[in-house]
Amino acid sequence: MNNYIKLNEDRWNNVKNDYTEPFTHEELEELRKNPISVALTVGKKVPKEWFEKANGKKILGLACGGGQQGPVFAIKGYDVTIMDFSKSQLQRDEMVAKREGLKINTVQGDMTKPFPFENETFDIIFNPVSNVYIEDLENMYKEAARVLKKGGLLMVGFMNPWIYMTLTLYGTNPTRNYC
């Protein structure tokens, strides 16, 4: 394992902030009342029409553990699998699923390695800003193409990592507007 991969895994297993805090029951109930609302980057919601273009509802949340996006997909009727290398992030999804009576499959995996899924498994792959944490994106895109059904949707968020330093420098903290 590359040192930066281990560093990232350790960070996500130990950090506590808005990105690692699972949604509460009340937050999910509010989200349940409205059309699907998730973000690939901080503060920028994905248009609900994007999800309507999918041929099915089998979704892979790639590197988006934490008990946030996965539960939103589940309450909207998606067949949800979350793959993340952080065991603690996956445990948050499992905790919310159990608390809310949702079905969310969790898989501990590294997106820099082969994905543990059959070819053409998913209708949608949802990958929020996580690609900034890996050096080589080639495997991630090759594997996403392999496990995505023909005509499937690949949604990937990009953000310049400088934003995280800027937020820290200026003392601001993004709120839950990212999901």
Question: Where does each model-flagged region fall?
Answer:
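Class I SAM-dependent methyltransferase SAM/SAH-binding core
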Residues: 52, 57-114
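A short acidic, Gly/Pro-enriched loop at the edge of an enzyme's catalytic core
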Residues: 112-125
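Conserved class I S-adenosyl-L-methionine
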Residues: 153-179
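Conserved alpha-helix/loop element of class I SAM-dependent methyltransferases that forms part
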Residues: 24-57
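A short glycine-rich, Lys/Arg-flanked "PGG" loop and its adjoining helix->strand segment in the class I
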Residues: 138-153
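A short SAM/SAH-binding and catalytic strip from SAM-dependent methyltransferases
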Residues: 123-138
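N-terminal, positively charged/glycine-rich alpha-helical extensions of SAM-dependent methyltransferases
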Residues: 1-29
